[in-house]
């Protein structure tokens, strides 16, 4: 028997039956701070397309991302509600302890640094991501984060 489980989010976790195998459901899922989907295109093939077809692919990829993220949020909200009601007393929902989160943050930073230094592209992507994260982090804190903290959701 498992002691605890967390995979992607309660919707997918419940499809796997994790709520039946473990009495504890821990959050946040440290291995995935946000859900995003992406499309990869062969650059040469993409650039060979007419501009209107490139725009079609760009918009289709963006639409699928927005739809998928919205669908993921809605289904996880419903599944979390089910965990709290249908499985009350069988599954306890707990936040990982702060010392554990601090250790995970430190360990993850080391792995990310190591992986980001393996190729020029990895360095470029990591630098871009880190720069953007530093830009939007303060905004997230005063916007969405503050709102959710105040409202209590």
PLM region spans:
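N-terminal secretory/targeting leader peptides
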Residues: 1-153
């Amino acid at each position: 028997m498992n002691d605890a489980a967390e995979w992607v989010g309660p919707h997918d976790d419940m499809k796997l039956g994790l709520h039946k195998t473990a009495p504890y459901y821990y959050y946040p899922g440290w291995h995935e701070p946000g859900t995003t989907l992406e499309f990869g295109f062969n650059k040469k093939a993409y650039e060979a397309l007419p501009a209107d077809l490139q725009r079609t692919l760009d918009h289709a990829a963006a639409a699928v991302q927005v739809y998928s993220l919205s669908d993921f949020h809605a289904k996880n909200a419903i599944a979390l509600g089910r965990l709290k009601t249908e499985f009350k007393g069988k599954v306890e929902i707990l936040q990982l302890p702060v010392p554990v989160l601090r250790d995970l943050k430190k360990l993850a930073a080391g792995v990310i640094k190591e992986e980001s230094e393996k190729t020029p592209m990895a360095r470029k992507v990591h630098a871009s991501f880190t720069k953007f994260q530093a830009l939007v982090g303060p905004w997230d804190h005063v916007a969405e984060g503050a709102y959710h903290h105040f409202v209590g959701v």
